[in-house]
Swiss-Prot record:
Cross-referenced NCBIfam families: murA, PRK09369.1
Positions contributing to UDP-N-acetyl-alpha-D-glucosamine binding: R94, R123, P124, I125, E126, L127, D310, V332
Name of the molecule in the record: UDP-N-acetylglucosamine 1-carboxyvinyltransferase 1
Pathway where this protein functions: Cell wall biogenesis; peptidoglycan biosynthesis
EC number(s) from the headed UniProt entry: 2.5.1.7
Keywords: Cell cycle, Cell division, Cell shape, Cell wall biogenesis/degradation, Cytoplasm, Peptidoglycan synthesis, Pyruvate, Transferase
Modified-residue entries (2-(S-cysteinyl)pyruvic acid O-phosphothioketal), positions: C118
Amino acid sequence: MDKIVVKGGKKLKGEVNINTAKNSVLPIIAGSILATDGVLINELPMLQDVFTICNVMEQLGYDLKIDKKENKLIVPPLNKDPLIPSEDLVKKMRASFLIMGPMIAKYGEFKLARPGGCNIGSRPIELHLKGLRALGAEDSNCGNGFVCIKAKKLTGSKIYLDFPSVGATENIMMAATMAKGTTVIENAAQEPEITDLINFLNSMGAKIYIEKPGKIIIEGVDSLTSTEYTPIYDRIEAGTFMVAAAITGSEIKINGVNKDHCSAIISKLKEAGTEFFDIHNDENSIIVKGNEEIKPINIKTMPYPGYPTDMQSQMMSLLSIAKGSSIITESVFENRFMNVDELRRMGANIQVEGRTALIEGVDNLTGCEVKATDLRAGAALILAGLVAKGETIVTDIYHIDRGYVEIENKFRALGADISRI
């Protein structure tokens, strides 16, 4: 199994290009099911999670065409009855469940294994099912970990989400695109990836708009047509490289940044002493400059527009060498402190009580062998390795490959001493 080896102490310089957002691409691929004709997705990130959902689509019966040279994906229409994806494949990734809404909308009946993904806490699919029930679908456990859903017809409804779940918002929204009448989702997720999915669906002929933050209205249509679409940039990958500049005290240029999407990340990094410089006539790039002294700060993760839980682990690595005490409160996922033990092995002083981590900054981290416990924790350990004394070996990097395209090559191009073995 591959490992990533980082020898710390190198300053970073140069520029890095950010990929399109994994968390946009996955629901967009699922949403392609709704089209009566083919869909072309540009700037496809070559990630393991993307390959997984493509495999799910292929097991449904779709004849996908991935152009790895041009980073494009063609999803042709399915001109036969869909098949059932294997349980083993679906359990690899939670986002596999995103095909449920589109499949019910288009075919009226479907069976799917309960999904998997990072083990970062309870993420029940009940919110998804509750929303689909409100549209007229019926679900049941059909044995061996499978969920069966069917609907003679879907009818628009007013749906209130108990929590602004991104996945539930996406699934309900896609199912409602071809429901009869109007669907209103209250307390809907507000993440940029939600808006991106709306723009994608509307480009196929859907009628979806955001009336106000947290309220989405869908007017059902008879069918959706083909489209060509380019997803938004990945704000979490951009944030990861921002932290890389901050933790190493380096100056780098990041290309492919929507600064509005990253506003909470940028705000907290500025509070910690990091500087940001806009580039004239280049709104999608930014220069990030870290300083020698990292200031301690407090962070509480929240649904968007709050500070993203997907950037919590990376910030913990940064604050582990801040000059003073910091507090991180994780309010989204209860198991997102699994990287703490690994950072402690490197010399970090972190105490956890429930959903709160108290971080006492130390002068230095020391390289050792650590394990990526999930996608973002793995990236955070690479960040820690960039500034640690000696050599850091990160194992279980298949987690990292789920969400970062050749992360070691991007860091090496910036001057880091990093390799995959």
